[in-house]
Amino acid sequence: MIQILTGTALLLVVLALFTLFSYKAPQGMKAMGALANAACASFLVEAFHFSLFGEQMGIKFLEGVGAANGSLGGVAAGILVPLALGVSPVYAVLVGLTVSGFGILPGFIAGYLVSFVIKFLEKKVPAGLDLIVIIVVAAPLTRGIAMVMDPVVKNTLLQIGQVLIQAQATSPILMGLILGGLITVVATAPLSSMALTSIIGLTGVPMGIGALAVFGSSFMNYQAHQVP
């Protein structure tokens, strides 16, 4: 019970911070939308193909498909976030490839911060030289930011996921009610529920609860956002 309450409290803190980022950070809402898209392109494919079709049904090919997508969440975020902030596609791909091997949140943070650096360099550096300067400056800067953020994420956000994963062994029904309810609420907030579950590294039963909650809330979101 204490583990569940601790994990839930930490999860609420994360939600508050990301909501604050969405509304107060420069172009925060666009960045969060790109993070959600990156999570869908990586986590959702992993949830279905790796966890469901692969591990549960034993289809090895689809398990490989899910594992491939799931391992590239950082690259997806590193590409989609700069694109959402108006960075040239070439530079967006440069940023994304540079964070290869890192998780979705380090890729997101690096992509977000370096986007402003790239846009500044594009304005200040003469045309023709901007590509070389951005390659020399932005690529190592992106990798450096991701390297700094990676242990921070592993020691904080991923620990929340581990607490929830361990808690399901003691009280799976209660944890399912809390986690499923929170993710459903998040689905209507600025932070994507898909992004949240991938950021905290849910696996196993909690990952299944997250996937089901996301799937169920998607119908509510579709109806709520239909244009009359």
Where are each of the predicted segments found?
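Pore-lining transmembrane helices
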Residues: 2-228
